[in-house]
Structures are given as C-alpha cells and as structure tokens.
C-alpha cells in the first residue's frame, strides 16, 4: 500500500523531520504492512506527518485551549458544526482507532521500559486508516464515529 495518497511529504517544505524524509525515500521501493510502523519509529513518523499534512491530524497539544483554538475552529467549519461539537470527535472514539490489547501491548513493548506508562498517559492507539500510533485526544479529517476498536 502506498502511504502517501496525494503528494510526497517532501512537497510540504520545512515542517518535516529528517527521519521521516529519509524514510519516505526508502519506502519508494518497499512495501510495508500496516503494523510495521509500531516498531519502526521513522515509518510511524512519516505516516503521522503525512496525516498531519493531508488530513489535518492534530491539534499539536490538545490540552492547550488557546494554542489549538484555530485548529478546532477549522474542524468545526469543515464539519459545519460548533467548536464544542467538533471537539467530541476524537481519535479515542473513532472507528479506525485500534486499542485491542495485543496492539496496545505491541506499542508499549516497542516504546521500551516506559511503554506501558506512556501508552496509558497518552491514550495511544493505532490508526487503521493511516498506519501510525495515534493519540486519543487528537482527531483528523477522516474521523468516523463508533470507535474505538477494542
């Protein structure tokens, strides 16, 4: 499966990590499986960065009301709703948010010694749409109700 749908991450200028850009070049000639990005941090970062650019994954810091104000206003406008209602549509309740025990354990193990703590604190899951470790407090333009997958 091609990770980049409409463009290349390198098309987006300076807001990219060198590791993700290197992985993008490497992946031109390789195929990956959805869960490969759980153990490959560069692939995870590539998939996440593409989702930020193509599907407006965010906000950067969901707990920062002031800093994420424009993000939520844009989401509300896109979905033709109020900011308050848009804020109820999060990765944590998306149908593509995989929080099956086996998935969570694999994520925690890949993180390392503090994996279980980090997974719990950030409410991490795996995005089945875009193949990256996803924070439950965020959202994207592809959000679909009815989740998570448990």
PLM region spans:
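Cysteine-centered metal-binding/redox modules
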Residues: 5-8, 13, 28-150
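Terminal and domain-boundary regions
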Residues: 19-22, 28
């Amino acid at each position: 499966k091609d990770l980049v749908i409409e463009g290349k991450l390198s098309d987006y200028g300076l807001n990219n990590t060198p590791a993700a850009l290197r992985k993008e070049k490497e992946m031109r000639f390789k195929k990956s499986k959805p869960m490969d990005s759980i153990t490959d941090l560069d692939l995870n970062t590539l998939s996440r960065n593409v989702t930020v650019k193509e599907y407006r994954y965010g906000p950067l810091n969901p707990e920062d009301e002031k800093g994420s104000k424009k993000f939520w206003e844009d989401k509300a406008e896109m979905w033709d709703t109020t900011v308050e209602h848009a804020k109820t549509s999060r990765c944590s309740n998306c149908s593509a948010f995989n929080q099956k025990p086996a998935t969570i354990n694999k994520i925690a193990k890949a993180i390392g010694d503090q994996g279980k703590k980090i997974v719990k604190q950030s409410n991490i899951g795996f995005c089945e749409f875009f193949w990256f470790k996803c924070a439950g407090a965020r959202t994207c333009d592809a959000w679909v109700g009815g989740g998570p997958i448990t």
